Amino acid sequence: MNSSLTVQRRGSDAELGPWVMAARSKDAALSQRDGVLPVKVEEDSPGSWEPSYPAAWPDPETSRLHFRQLRYQEVAGPEEALSRLRELCRRWLRPELLSKEQILELLVLEQFLTILPEELQAWVREHCPESGEEAVAVVRALQRALDGTSPQGMVTFEDMAVSLTWEEWERLDPARRDFCRESAQKDSGSTVPPSLESRVENKELIPMQQILEEVEPQGQLQEAFQGKHPLFSKCGSTHEDRVEKQSGNPLPLKLENSAEAEGLNSISDVNKNGSIEGEDSKNNELQNSARCSNLVLCQHIPKAERPTDGEEHGNKCKQSFHMVAWHVLKPHKSDSGDSFHHSSFFETQRQLHEERPYKCGNCGKSFKQRSDLFRHQRIHTGEKPYGCQECGKSFSQSAALTKHQRTHTGEKPYTCLKCGERFRQNSHLNRHQSTHSRDKHFKCEECGETCRISNLFRHQRLHKGERPYKCEECKKSFKQRSDLFKHHRIHTGEKPYGCSVCGKRFNQSATLIKHQRIHTGEKPYKCLECGERFRQSTHLIRHQRIHQNKMLSVGRGAHACNPSPLGGQGRRII
């Protein structure tokens, strides 16, 4: 059996998917820049493992979720469970494609996202970071946004699709910066005049007129209006419907606010706040730190060549052009016409618009993955496969069991950085941290209670008596939309929550939980006076009144009559 150094492509680019293609192209380009040819040591053995049907494999993130969410109850036995885990892990980490360092980076990145606070996890995962450095940069950008720091002086580049200060950009390896620009230009198939590129690098001011003069002699202006030039990207959004493609505050070198085409002749028409200035300020040059992307340039196109005609052109232009810095390209396009800086954003857009084939037969809710449907159906069936070994309490989700077990172990993994107090759950830490940051909360003028802005409006309805959600059947009104949905089940007779033991069905999940205690014998409510336990809180309250009445009767007997030294008359002690 001979060993040889081979450079082999396993499958076509379409089979590998955008995630693996991006990782391979970046690593290969950087290696070639350093004069190193990436090779892979393989054995020329007919029995060497090859991936089966790679074209049918899901993307690595989906495989990771399947690997982490696989449950023993879903397989026939321990052998199948181990085999499934090995196959899912191979589909996730793809050892035949990625190096050991890349696999380690994936594992470290996953653990980093896992230990993030819950409020940060969702935001960071939405940006699909492909390395630990990208994840750190996204977290830092979010922290700056939450702290209210100004985004001025920031620059965005395609390789990371996150915001960096000019100082951080300048500290990057020059080879990495050059690679980012060269890769962006290769992806777009166009180049930018060196004179303009150098001026952007030096943070100089460039009027729109000079940009047009530099681009037009090269025959690229028409390409720009067709969306082929890296200076521009074309989208199908309207001026009113335009939404930001990246979360957080708008970044400089990008006009995040779409401007009306009418009366807009140069970039200088947009001030630092992203708004359009008057005619007198047309000659003012835009600071690089201003918010300068998504600037509608339709005004520069001759009317005969404009893609739409009539009055709707200024309000609903289907081919509006948006100004973008040339090292911040948007090469990935979705079916809706929107362009994205990074393949991960394009993948997120694709997932948002793809169909949800797995539908719940009880409530009609749809899901993209079968595993999500299985978890959802436990709400209706009342199934709780995860049991606590200490007290026997069961849960429908493994995460809920993990949180519950901390009550037995005493583990408190969440620490307040300001006072050092520890908590079992992240939500408890968040609630505690609000006591340190009262200035970020809003105070109710009626009762003085402080709460977040999202809860303030809901809280104020308690004082106003406002009930904006009305039932069309019986005209009954409710303060919360969720209460109206629950009430509708009375009229429709819908009972989506069924007991898995006796088959009895209920219209509310809380009622099902109370009913299941009959089968499990669970009595979570304990009287502190006598130690007696109850299944429902209402039973405990009724029982506590017995102790209260006894205390009142004993108090009246001891203090009802007290001999008076004045005349032997009794007096009542109040």
From Swiss-Prot:
Keywords tagged on the record: DNA-binding, Isopeptide bond, Metal-binding, Nucleus, Phosphoprotein, Repeat, Transcription, Transcription regulation, Ubl conjugation, Zinc, Zinc-finger
Cross-link named Glycyl lysine isopeptide (Lys-Gly) (interchain with G-Cter in SUMO2), sites: K40, K203, K228, K254, K282, K443
Annotated segments matching region Disordered: 182-202, 231-284
Start-end of Polar residues biased regions: 265-274
SUPFAM superfamilies: beta-beta-alpha zinc fingers (SSF57667), KRAB domain (Kruppel-associated box) (SSF109640), Retrovirus capsid dimerization domain-like (SSF47353)
The keyword Transmembrane is assigned to this record: no
Phosphoserine: residues carrying this PTM: S12
Localization per Swiss-Prot or TrEMBL: Nucleus
Sequence ranges assigned to domain SCAN box in this UniProt record: 64-146
One Pfam family it belongs to: KRAB
Family (UniProt): Belongs to the krueppel C2H2-type zinc-finger protein family.
Protein name: Zinc finger protein 394
Classification of source organism: Eukaryota, Metazoa, Chordata, Craniata, Vertebrata
